[in-house]
Amino acid sequence: MSTPKFQTGLFINNEFVDSLDGSTFDVFNPYDNSLLAKVSEAKKADVDRAVAAARKAFPAWAAMSPSDRGVLIGKLADAIEKDRDNLSLLETLDTGHPIRDTRNLDVMRTVATFRYFAGMPDKNEGTVIPVDAGFLNYVTRVPVGVVGQVVPWNFPLMFTSWKLGPALAAGNTVVMKQAELTPLSTLRVAELAREVGFPAGVINVVPGYGHIAGQYLAEHMGVDKVSFTGSTMTGRKIVQASAGNLKRVQLELGGKGANIIFEDANLDAAVNGSAFAIFHNQGQACIAGSRLMLHEKIADQFLDKFLKLAASIKLGNPLDPTTEMGPLTSKMHQERVLGFCKVAQEEGGEILLGGKIPSNPELQKGCFVEPTVVRSKTIKDRVCQEEVFGPFVVVSTFKDDAEVLEMANNTIYGLGGGLWTNNLQRAHLMARHMEAGMVWINCYKRFHPGSPFGGIKDSGYGREMGHFAMHEYTEPKSVWVNIDAKIPVFYPR
């Protein structure tokens, strides 16, 4: 195995530096829990340095020609694509994602996102509002300012592009707090950004712990907006922390996606799509189809096929190109997912498959959990209501459309959901009434840089991607011009 190229310092003002107090944290390979690197840990003073650098860089970056900003973002996309082998290896070692996924999905989706937003700076159009005679009223969109971004550990590289792309395109400068579990690919992106010519202070990366660096970034009076992806519990803390200067907040939080299989669905397609919905990335996805709802007429037939497919998924070394499922990203998270397997049994549920660490001796040192399928006792069970965030799917059955719609919406979350049917009317009616920011029909977990991504209810607010994201990172400015209006004298003398 070749050794990937990466940095371990904080990235502030275009330099990799140690934290001011010399603090570091350990980064582990979840395949065998071996030490990958010691990375500088950002504390409050380091966040202050990064915010100051971003604040200093903001006026010139915001004033730069939009097309020039786009050229730089495009160059970053090209550099990431050129670094594909290195970045995919780095992401696999850091996260446990199988190399086939990091190479073909994570890196290439990152490239596609930066390329999309490379074309957006000069398309951030304003409007002219028809107002009273004699006046011209035009509205421009201006950058928010210094943006704090908190990136999660489940897709660190891809989410770096989701947040950096629109923020930079809109003319903002950024301080990004990467998760302590998986900081390496984001630091590499920062290094590539410097190489292609991004000015000092435009991009700053401060890896660290959420309760220290993340909390302080959300509180910081020098930050104008915070964008957070992570748990709902932490999202609430972000909102509270941001109140000091009433900064704008964008949240993409937890999910408990309903994946509904109707009696007229193409079962083979639904089986494969449903397995992808929950087992891709070891189930560590906020949009995972973690509640599998089967029409009672096809439940047994579907389950027979689904269980056979799930049992055949190849767990192994994520560097092996034939591996289909790698480890969870940390030992702590492995223990959490295994804990839900115990909860399922305590609640009277039936574990139909998995629920344990694989018996293969080669996998014992890692953070593996077998693909797990559970039949719940009621939809009010914890395993049906709480986000597990692992290769753990709960199965239930339904009789008709009205019942399954009620089941699907019986959750605090509202991020994504899917349904499989050949009935066009049913498909659109269900999509209309499902309480989710995204609905997939005869597919699951599809997204594109131009399509809005985000949720409702306890899954947060605001949107990633597309023109919607550009609006998240800009403010409308209304300008009134008196051309030849006859304004009455208000104080006649």
Feature roles, as predicted:
Residues 1-31, 356:
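Hydrophobic face of amphipathic alpha-helices that form TPR/SEL1-like repeat modules
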Residues 33, 69, 91, 114, ...:
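Residue-level signal for inorganic ion chemistry
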Residues 34-38, 260, 314, 341, ...:
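Conserved C-terminal structural/oligomerization subdomain of aldehyde/semialdehyde dehydrogenase
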Residues 34-124, 134:
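Glycine-rich loop-to-alpha-helix module at the N-terminal edge of alpha/beta enzyme cores
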Residues 36-42, 57-63, 149, 259-262, ...:
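Short, well-ordered beta-strand elements within core beta-sheets of diverse protein domains
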Residues 58, 62, 77-84, 88, ...:
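Structural signal for hydrophobic packing residues in well-ordered secondary-structure cores
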Residues 81, 126-269, 398:
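Rossmann-like NAD(P) dinucleotide-binding subdomain of oxidoreductase/dehydrogenase enzymes
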Residues 233-378, 402, 441, 488-492:
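ALDH superfamily catalytic-core signature
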